[in-house]
């Protein structure tokens, strides 16, 4: 396939350094799955006896799920479908939409599917910290039941501290993530080898025949077990989502060189332990270690789960930023916590909402076993959407025929469907929680997209063509005042409403006038040579278009200051006034938006509380003049 692109350029870092960094960020979530995956796979509620053949089959199912879903689907297929080196469901959605538009197909169904997959990720972002931290701290119950009442308060304390720390950024402690994660995977491998030595026949689980026999022998019961097996590959989406940070080669090297072998050894070791001692099913992960290592492992597991949670939280920030810049979410205040790494961001509004949702999940479900029922729905749903979007990229973007596109993705779609179906069996037991979170975010995104369309249509109904307006204006030109006026407008060919209001009320025009349009492209970044386009309109008026990718920081002040001399414009920001329109949305029953009245009110609320455009575009507040307009939709 021809979708592979070279790794992102990291001239200051070697492949070894990138691989070490990827271990801490990419593999934190999937690396902590041994804490609960085996325990939940053999949960007595499934009604499958703990006999040797069943244990071999269950462990084999876990190993081959990792092989098929992670090694084959993500590492070999999905990571090729990158958007100029950038991964993640928003980047893939943008790529799929552009691929479909090129051949004249309607993008609406793909947009709906992609946004739903992105919405489900937020359910995962809520459950991952809750599940991971709870399962780590539950290890202290293995040592003594006297500490059991403190597990929940300790988990709440760790999570609150984690979210409160977000505003400081991860630059200071991020360097520790890789080394700590290496120690974690080595500890997984060592314990696994120790367990295998107690029952070497567990190596028979490496054969897929045991997994197939397990599924065929137990029928519907084994189908329900798949809902627990999928816990072994939660976090696989991170391999794709973090491609832009590390490149595909370091991520693949870390997976095949350390992560997959360590996970396989640990799962085999836990299986051997259960065969030797069936009572170990209470907590096979911690019971795999000698008693003297229990509390050090609880501490190490807590550190590993905090790292996993941090990676998920950072992923939610990144997804939200991309969603804002692609126009799927309202503007929020995005704080850059590092001067050197543009990807290290903090979104206060999202952080607060995530913290509340995570605490609700922890206190509401109370244990990792209860959370396990809720965990799988969001993960498998997002994975299915990723595979579907990849099909559209292969077929429409890479121009492979339908048969080859189905051959490449059909098997993985079937596997994803099986896991989605098995996780839906647990909707009543807790699977409803991420579905409610995802549905809520989905409605918010759809409402914002439709509301912005309705607003633009409403504004266009009163638009005046810019060219003809300027021609008539300068037949009897208004007085000119010193300085530069920049009018931000989403439509470069029409007169900005802020200019009309300025002329009506002040009856003057600056000596230099710029009509500025900022366009967000469906690519990760826009080369500096293509960022700005300047068009003289006469009478010292100019039309400027700035282009940014969804991974760029839309810094208008910097972009204007960096205009090449050939453009004929030099900007002194302190001698420039920026005129912005701010629409006050009024929800009107039976308005032109076509939305239900409650959605119109929701859009009006989101619009009213959206982040300030001046802050978002990094325009100095003391150079901004904001003009309000009331609009009914």
UniProtKB/Swiss-Prot annotation:
It catalyses: K(+)(in) + H(+)(in) = K(+)(out) + H(+)(out). InterPro entries: K+_transporter, K_trans_C, K_trans_N, Kup. One of its GO terms (molecular function) is symporter activity. The chain crosses the membrane at residues 59-79, 110-130, 145-165, 173-193, 219-239, 256-276, 287-307, 345-365, 374-394, 402-422, 429-449. Keywords: Cell inner membrane, Cell membrane, Ion transport, Membrane, Potassium, Potassium transport, Symport, Transmembrane, Transmembrane helix, Transport. It is a multi-pass membrane protein. Its main location: membrane. GO terms for cellular component: plasma membrane. Disulfide bonds: none annotated. It is found in: Cell inner membrane. Belongs to the HAK/KUP transporter (TC 2.A.72) family. HAMAP family: Kup. Transport of potassium into the cell. Likely operates as a K(+):H(+) symporter. This is Probable potassium transport system protein Kup 2.
């Amino acid at each position: 396939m021809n979708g592979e692109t070279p790794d992102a350029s990291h001239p200051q870092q070697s492949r070894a350094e990138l691989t070490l960094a990827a271990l801490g960020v990419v593999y934190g979530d999937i690396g902590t799955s041994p804490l609960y995956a085996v325990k939940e796979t053999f949960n007595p509620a499934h009604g499958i006896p703990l006999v040797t053949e069943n244990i071999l089959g269950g462990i084999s199912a876990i190993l081959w799920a990792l092989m098929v879903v992670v090694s084959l689907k993500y590492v070999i297929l999905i990571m090729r479908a990158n958007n100029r080196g950038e991964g993640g469901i928003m980047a893939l959605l943008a790529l799929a939409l552009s691929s479909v538009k090129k051949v004249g197909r309607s993008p609406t169904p793909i947009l709906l599917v992609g946004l739903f997959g992105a919405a489900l990720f937020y359910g995962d972002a809520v459950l991952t910290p809750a599940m991971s931290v709870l399962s780590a701290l539950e290890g202290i119950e293995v040592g003594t039941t006297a500490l059991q009442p403190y597990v929940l308060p300790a988990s709440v304390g760790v999570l609150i501290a984690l979210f409160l720390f977000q505003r400081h950024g991860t630059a200071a402690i991020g360097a520790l993530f890789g080394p700590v994660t290496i120690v974690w995977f080595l500890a997984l491998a060592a314990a696994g080898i120790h367990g295998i030595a107690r029952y070497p026949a567990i190596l028979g689980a490496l054969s897929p025949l045991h997994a197939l026999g397990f599924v065929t022998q137990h029928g519907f019961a084994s189908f329900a077990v798949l809902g627990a097996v999928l816990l072994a590959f939660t976090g696989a989406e991170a391999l794709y989502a973090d491609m832009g940070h590390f490149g595909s080669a370091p991520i693949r090297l870390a997976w095949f060189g350390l992560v997959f072998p360590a996970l396989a050894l640990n799962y085999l070791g836990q299986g051997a332990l259960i065969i030797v001692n069936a009572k170990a099913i209470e907590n096979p992960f911690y019971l795999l270690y000698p008693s003297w290592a229990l509390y050090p492992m609880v501490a190490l597991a807590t550190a590993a789960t905090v790292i996993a949670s941090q990676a998920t939280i950072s992923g939610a920030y990144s997804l939200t930023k991309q969603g804002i810049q692609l126009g799927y979410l309202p503007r929020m205040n995005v704080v850059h916590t590092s001067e050197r790494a543009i990807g290290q961001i903090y979104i206060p509004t999202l952080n607060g909402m995530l913290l509340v949702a995570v605490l609700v999940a922890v206190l509401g479900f109370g244990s990792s076993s209860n959370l396990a029922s809720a965990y799988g729905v969001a993960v498998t749903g997002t994975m299915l959407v990723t595979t579907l979007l990849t099909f559209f990229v292969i077929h429409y973007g890479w121009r492979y025929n339908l048969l080859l596109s189905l051959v490449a993705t059909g098997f993985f779609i079937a596997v994803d469907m099986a896991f989605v179906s098995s996780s839906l069996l647990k909707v009543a037991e807790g699977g409803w929680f991420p579905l409610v979170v995802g549905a809520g975010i989905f409605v918010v995104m759809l409402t914002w997209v439709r509301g912005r369309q309705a607003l633009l249509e409403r504004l266009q109904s009163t638009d005046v063509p810019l060219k003809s307006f300027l021609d008539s204006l300068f037949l009897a030109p208004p007085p000119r005042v010193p300085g530069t006026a920049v009018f931000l407008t989403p439509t470069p060919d029409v007169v900005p409403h802020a200019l009309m209001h300025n002329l009506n009320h002040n009856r003057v025009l600056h000596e230099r006038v710029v009509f500025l349009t900022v366009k967000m492209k469906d690519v990760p970044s826009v080369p500096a040579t293509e960022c700005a386009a300047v068009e003289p309109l006469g009478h010292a008026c100019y039309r400027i278009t700035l282009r940014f990718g969804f991974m760029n920081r839309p810094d208008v002040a910097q972009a204007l200051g960096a205009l090449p001399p050939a453009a004929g414009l030099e900007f002194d920001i302190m001698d420039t006034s920026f005129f912005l329109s701010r629409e006050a949305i009024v929800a009107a029953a039976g308005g032109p938006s076509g939305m239900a009245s409650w959605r119109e009110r929701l859009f009006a609320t989101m619009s009213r509380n959206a982040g300030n455009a001046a802050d978002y575009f990094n325009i100095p507040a003391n150079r901004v003049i904001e003009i309000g307009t009331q609009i009914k939709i």
